């Protein structure tokens, strides 16, 4: 792989980073098999270097640059180039350069690990040129004043972050929403496999069009979308969702990105599709499902699962998390009686889930077995009975519900006087196998 490191003689931060990279490359420890580092120093501003990759035959361009800000803070950043709107700082309006999401994520993760005291590290949203490139690229920057631009410690941190970057199975995303330093996207990239190709500031969402979205998706090599919903106003958010409905890009939340684990994106998307067909709108709860298998659905008796969740939802969900399955949750986060697993596990998983439910019910509730029937008896505080005995709603209800006797006038009302009993029978053929 050939990587070209581009800096400008006019840019003190770029010069600092380049010098520190050259120092590190003199050490054999930083020589990496399969990577050929090439330096390219120019005289002009980096943001105006359209088509600079012509004839380079590089696989990746990394622009070494200074960062400026109206509110200068010591910062190390990475970002792709492009102009969602006007081209105020190089490039073309409504144009986006090919991104390198995995490499940007890897460099960002290293920057956070190596960041000097007093500095911060983050993404920046997509902005400025150059945009007319055919080679994937990104900027890595030191900000935001002369002091930081010439700081050899900051330069060394960036140099090591670049030279040791190693993308690991990233999921390429477009990020929508947030401020200039993209705090949520930064957190996602640090904590999950989500790697952003392009990121749009909240103010750009309202002006987004379908054709612009298509350009961004292509330049970002996007597999999915992440939205910082809290950072986008409702009209712009509705506009964005309407545009996304015309694409095949799934929207992934932070929780979902955390759950994907080591599953390949293709495997995860297949599971997501199966879940959508089986229970539209359901959310996935991924257990210990390994990669490689034929995914199938399986069901457990809905009434049995409901009783087990009522008895101890935490126990059931913890067990699901330890099984090679994908659980599905509906409204309110309740587990649905449909699970996804691999075909080779299906029979055993059904047996294990039914056994889990039966044991949970028997251990947490008053339940007995009668042949193929699991009979569950529940006693509950009955507010109707309490009211019929003259107990006013409020604190006395709470005391009775908690097992305390109360006095109403001359009468003592005991908890057992205001309880009603329900009996539920669940039929399970071969129930003895699950006890």
Curated annotation (Swiss-Prot):
Entry keyword annotation includes Zinc: yes
Gene3D superfamilies per record: AF0625-like
InterPro entries attached to this UniProt entry: Deacylase_DtdA_archaea, DtdA
Molecular function GO terms recorded: D-aminoacyl-tRNA deacylase activity; zinc ion binding
Cofactor-binding details, from the entry: Binds 2 Zn(2+) ions per subunit.
Keywords tagged on the record: Hydrolase, Metal-binding, Zinc
Catalysis: reaction(s): a D-aminoacyl-tRNA + H2O = a tRNA + a D-alpha-amino acid + H(+); glycyl-tRNA(Ala) + H2O = tRNA(Ala) + glycine + H(+)
Role according to the record: D-aminoacyl-tRNA deacylase with broad substrate specificity. By recycling D-aminoacyl-tRNA to D-amino acids and free tRNA molecules, this enzyme counteracts the toxicity associated with the formation of D-aminoacyl-tRNA entities in vivo.
Subunit structure: Monomer.
Membership in a protein family: Belongs to the DtdA deacylase family.
Protein name per Swiss-Prot or TrEMBL: D-aminoacyl-tRNA deacylase
């Amino acid at each position: 792989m050939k990587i070209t490191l581009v800096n400008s003689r006019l840019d003190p931060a770029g010069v600092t980073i380049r010098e520190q990279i050259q120092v590190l490359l003199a050490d054999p420890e930083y020589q990496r098999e399969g990577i050929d580092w090439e330096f390219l120093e120019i005289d002009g501003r980096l943001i105006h270097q359209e088509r600079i990759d012509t004839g380079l035959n590089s696989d990746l361009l990394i622009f070494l640059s200074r960062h400026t800000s109206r509110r200068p803070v010591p910062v190390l950043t990475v970002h792709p180039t492009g102009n969602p709107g006007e081209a105020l700082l190089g490039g073309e309006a409504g144009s986006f350069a090919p991104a390198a999401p995995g490499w940007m994520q890897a460099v960002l993760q290293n920057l956070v690990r190596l960041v000097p005291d007093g500095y911060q590290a983050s993404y920046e949203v997509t902005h400025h040129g150059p945009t007319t490139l055919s080679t994937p690229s990104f900027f890595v920057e030191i900000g935001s004043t002369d002091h930081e631009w010439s700081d050899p410690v900051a330069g060394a941190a960036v140099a090591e972050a670049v030279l040791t970057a190693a993308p690991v199975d990233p999921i390429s995303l477009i990020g929508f929403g947030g401020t200039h330093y993209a705090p949520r996207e930064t957190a996602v990239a640090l904590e999950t496999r989500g790697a952003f190709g392009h990121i749009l500031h909240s103010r750009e969402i309202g002006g987004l069009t379908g054709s612009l979205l298509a350009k961004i998706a292509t330049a970002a090599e996007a597999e999915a979308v992440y939205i910082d919903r809290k950072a986008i106003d409702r009209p712009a958010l509705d506009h964005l969702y309407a545009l996304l409905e015309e694409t095949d890009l799934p929207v992934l939340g932070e929780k979902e990105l955390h759950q994907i684990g080591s599953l390949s994106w293709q495997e995860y998307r297949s599971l997501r599709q199966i879940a959508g067909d089986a229970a539209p709108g359901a959310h996935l709860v991924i257990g210990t499902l390994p990669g490689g298998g034929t995914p199938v659905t399986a069901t457990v008796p809905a009434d049995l699962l409901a009783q087990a969740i009522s008895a101890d939802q935490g126990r059931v969900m913890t067990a699901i998390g330890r099984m090679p399955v994908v659980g599905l949750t509906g409204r309110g986060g309740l587990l649905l009686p449909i699970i996804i697993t691999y075909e080779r596990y299906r029979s055993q998983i059904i047996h294990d889930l039914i056994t889990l439910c039966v044991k949970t019910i028997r251990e947490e509730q008053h339940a007995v077995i009668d042949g193929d029937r699991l009979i569950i008896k529940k006693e509950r505080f009955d507010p109707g009975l309490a009211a019929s005995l003259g107990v006013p709603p409020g604190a006395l209800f709470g005391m009775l519900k908690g097992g305390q006797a109360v006095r109403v006038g001359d009468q003592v009302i005991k908890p057992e006087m205001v309880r009603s009993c329900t009996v539920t029978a669940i039929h399970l053929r071969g129930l003895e196998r699950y006890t």
